[in-house]
From Swiss-Prot:
Molecular function terms, GO-annotated: 4 iron, 4 sulfur cluster binding; cyclic pyranopterin monophosphate synthase activity; GTP 3',8'-cyclase activity; GTP binding; metal ion binding; S-adenosyl-L-methionine binding
Catalytic function, reaction form: GTP + AH2 + S-adenosyl-L-methionine = (8S)-3',8-cyclo-7,8-dihydroguanosine 5'-triphosphate + 5'-deoxyadenosine + L-methionine + A + H(+)
Positions of the Radical SAM core domain: 24-248
Keywords: 4Fe-4S, GTP-binding, Iron, Iron-sulfur, Lyase, Metal-binding, Molybdenum cofactor biosynthesis, Nucleotide-binding, S-adenosyl-L-methionine
Binding site for [4Fe-4S] cluster 1: 40, 44, 47
Biological or metabolic pathway of the protein: Cofactor biosynthesis; molybdopterin biosynthesis
Binding site for GTP: 33, 82, 115, 175, 277-279
Gene expressing this chain: moaA
Tagged with keyword Calcium: no
Cofactor note as given: Binds 2 [4Fe-4S] clusters. Binds 1 [4Fe-4S] cluster coordinated with 3 cysteines and an exchangeable S-adenosyl-L-methionine and 1 [4Fe-4S] cluster coordinated with 3 cysteines and the GTP-derived substrate.
Record-linked Pfam families: Fer4_12, Mob_synth_C, Radical_SAM
PANTHER family hit by this protein: MOLYBDENUM COFACTOR BIOSYNTHESIS PROTEIN 1, MOLYBDOPTERIN COFACTOR SYNTHESIS PROTEIN A
Species of the source: Rhizobium etli (strain ATCC 51251 / DSM 11541 / JCM 21823 / NBRC 15573 / CFN 42)
Protein's recorded name: GTP 3',8-cyclase
UniProt subunit comment: Monomer and homodimer.
């Protein structure tokens, strides 16, 4: 990678020596997750209602504005950007933003990646790789096509498999993400593990999070991953390893397959003490914590002037409000989410 300094449009100068932002608890903020759209071509039962009301398209930042915002964060020490949604690849002309951000790799940005449901991968995989994307996360909760249809409501299992094939053929490494749902897919996790490891992919299992109103009762879906790990250890030898990808997963090595298995446990063993990330929505709202409602409006600063001084000041002020941890709780006595906004707005 080169270490040149450059400026793109009115965006902030990009430099590899930018010092990371430090929050009130001494954590360096080096990771930006950008939800480029709240729209999705699936309606996963744990994520959103089937008849979702999405943001008016006129409220979304333009791709050029998202590029400028990302550039400001890179100038302030962010070295990893993940594009999320909704489903990021359904955003019109999204590859424009991917190309612009990919051009910043080596100029302050170390890695550009994305989380996807895989539905659009078959047509975008080669170009994603050409733009510098080397790793992606694909959400896949089951290998049973009928159950896949049930949980996604609108999803096409074969299309996702084609997308995984295309991404691997293009040279992109894949990590599968599976949300563990009690009495739905918990018995399938061993098969998902064998499938992933058999194809050279990591697997991460995730506890369901209480975000947004859905038709399902999350207390019925919730499965502590400590229970899942105990079940897996009846079949596999799991050894804790010191492996980090910049995210919250804690990894083990599976002796029988040789592959890695990650656990993301926001409910039973939160990852707040090492949190290095903030989340930007497609409307320019910055959430300093996934599980808190406090937010900063960066759109106003972005549009106030072509100079980035005001934007940088707004980002700095927001980081001073990054909390120590989230407020997630699964509580059957209060049948409401801990955070009202849906994951598709915040970016999962």
């Amino acid at each position: 990678m080169n270490n040149r300094v450059g400026t793109i449009g009115n965006a902030s100068p990009l430099t590899a020596d930018a010092h990371p932002m430090i929050d009130p608890f001494g954590r360096a903020v080096t990771y930006l997750r950008v939800s480029v759209t709240d729209r999705c071509d699936f309606r996963c039962t744990y994520c959103m209602a089937e008849n979702m009301t999405f943001l008016p398209k006129k409220d979304l930042l333009t791709l050029e504005e998202l590029d400028r915002l990302c550039s400001a964060f890179i100038a302030k020490g962010v070295s990893k950007i993940r594009l999320t949604g909704g489903e990021p690849l359904v955003r019109k002309n999204i590859m424009y933003l991917v190309r612009k951000l990919g051009a910043k790799i080596g100029s302050g940005l170390d890695e550009l990646t994305l989380t996807t449901n895989g539905s659009q991968l078959s047509r975008h995989a080669a170009e994603l790789h050409d733009c510098g994307v080397r790793r992606i996360n694909v959400s896949l909760d089951t290998l049973d096509p009928d159950k896949f249809r049930k949980i996604t409501r609108w999803g096409d299992f074969d299309k996702v498999m084609e997308g995984i094939d295309a991404a691997q053929k293009a040279g992109i490494k894949i990590k599968l993400n599976a949300v563990a749902l009690k009495n739905f897919n918990d018995a399938e996790i061993p098969d998902l593990l064998r499938f992933a490891h058999g194809r050279g992919m990591d697997l991460t299992v995730i506890e369901t999070m209480p975000m947004g109103e859905i038709e399902e009762d999350r207390t019925d879906q919730y499965l502590p991953l400590s229970e899942l790990r105990a079940d897996l250890e009846r079949q596999f030898t799991l050894t804790d390893i010191d492996y980090q990808t910049g995210g919250p997963a804690r990894y083990v090595r599976v002796s029988e397959t040789g592959g890695r298995l990650g656990f993301i446990t926001p409910m039973t063993h939160n990852f707040c003490e090492s949190c290095n990330r903030v989340r930007l929505t497609c409307t320019g709202t910055l959430y300093m914590c996934l599980g808190q409602n406090d937010a900063a409006d960066l759109r106003a600063a972005l549009r106030a002037t072509e100079d980035d001084a005001l934007l940088h000041a707004a980002i700095d002020e927001a980081i001073t409000r990054k909390p120590k941890g989230h407020d997630f709780i699964i509580d059957r006595t209060h049948n409401r989410p801990a955070v009202a906004r849906h994951m598709s707005v915040t970016g999962g």
